[in-house]
A protein has these predicted regions:
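NAD(P)+-binding Rossmann beta1-loop-alpha1 motif at the extreme N-terminus of oxidoreductases
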Residues: 1-52, 56, 63-67, 73
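Conserved short-loop catalytic and cofactor-binding motifs
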Residues: 31, 60, 107, 111
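Charged/polar, solvent-exposed surface patches and flexible loops
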Residues: 41-45, 71-74, 90, 121, ...
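A conserved beta-strand/loop capping segment in the N-terminal third of enzymes
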Residues: 53-94
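Rossmann-like NAD(P)(H) cofactor-binding subdomain of soluble oxidoreductases
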Residues: 78-129
Length: 129
């Protein structure tokens, strides 16, 4: 692992947007996974999320935006999940990249519908992290 940790944030809602803003305010370059190609294009062109916290502006050169969850996992040391619990399993099913040696944080509230578990327990039981 290199000296400066590389962060990846997963989720393009208001919570994910706020987390990305905090990380970029600290001077970090941040990988940001969002499902919406149109939101990604808008952020690149206009410097803000069109759907959530639209008054929050980003220095686009600090962002590595992608609709490919695996691309952001592979480019990051620290993974911060901010995907709503109702959609979490659907997004995690797209994962093929290794999570080995990754630092993983959940910023997700609620219960995962597929398992009935809180997110931390779901991660541990299904993915062993």
């Amino acid at each position: 692992m290199q000296d400066k940790l590389r962060f990846g944030v997963f989720g393009g809602g208001s919570w994910g947007t706020a987390i990305v803003k905090m990380l970029t305010e600290n001077g970090d370059r941040v990988g940001w996974y969002m499902r919406s190609d149109s939101a990604i294009r808008h952020i690149i062109k206009e410097g803000h999320n069109p759907n959530y916290l639209s008054s929050v502006e980003f220095e686009v050169e600090q962002l590595h935006l992608s609709p490919d969850i695996n691309e952001i996992v592979e480019a990051s040391d620290v993974l911060i999940f901010a995907i709503p619990s109702a959609f979490l399993e659907g997004e995690l099913q797209k994962l093929t990249a290794s999570l080995k040696d990754k630092i993983i944080f959940s910023a997700i509230k609620g219960i995962v519908p597929e398992s009935g578990l809180i997110v931390g327990e779901h991660f541990h039981e299904k993915y062993r992290f």
